[in-house]
């Protein structure tokens, strides 16, 4: 049972008892920093906040068929934690689990606050601390203050340092242009960032707009699911074969 005194003693709950560090984002960047903080400053009080309902960042948000890394995992992964699989590229689910294990080793799971959106952080010059507003019960896609929206609460956190590892785009909603005449389209328009878990592709005609990294991984996966796929692109991409097994990394692991 927690009391009001317990809450006051909680690190970050007051200017008199601030955190040493608040990390925003529980993806690769945030967990990488958590590891180094845990190694270099074991006595620090720190927390990790993420607006999503699980860690992983990009690898939690994106769940479309075929999602994988674009770079080899020997260079994309953590330098302190070798990629445990033999594959050159990492699948989305494997990368997310890889991040989770790194977070566990760093002690970040015990300091992780999910569904906690950092609404703002302001430097208090008099106190030499950051005053951070963390909103729970809502996400970055919602508007209004906690008092204006039912179920949302605010927690003020005080910290000596703030590190933003949240990336540069919104995880709540991807870029979605409106196409002329789309109101007359009888089919379904889907953004890979909000891929439905129950989507049936077998026997469907699918048009993939664009030929970037997402399209290159999505198209063959849709073909394997039985869809008839057409790629609509402005400029053709250069595509070449890539070994599925990383023989160099496997050699160094011996």
List each language-model region with its residue ranges:
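Conserved N-terminal glycine/acidic-rich loop preference
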Residues: 2-32, 51-83, 102
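A generic local structural motif
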Residues: 7-10, 135-137, 149-151, 175-177, ...
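Rossmann-like dinucleotide-binding core of oxidoreductases
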Residues: 13-18, 22-23, 28, 32-33, ...
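FAD-dinucleotide binding site
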Residues: 18, 40-47, 54-56, 61-62, ...
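General small-molecule cofactor/ligand-binding pocket signal
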Residues: 47, 111-115, 190-191
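Glycine-rich active-site loop/strand segments that organize a redox cofactor
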Residues: 54-98, 236-254
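Feature captures the FAD/FMN-dependent oxidoreductase FAD-binding
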Residues: 86-169
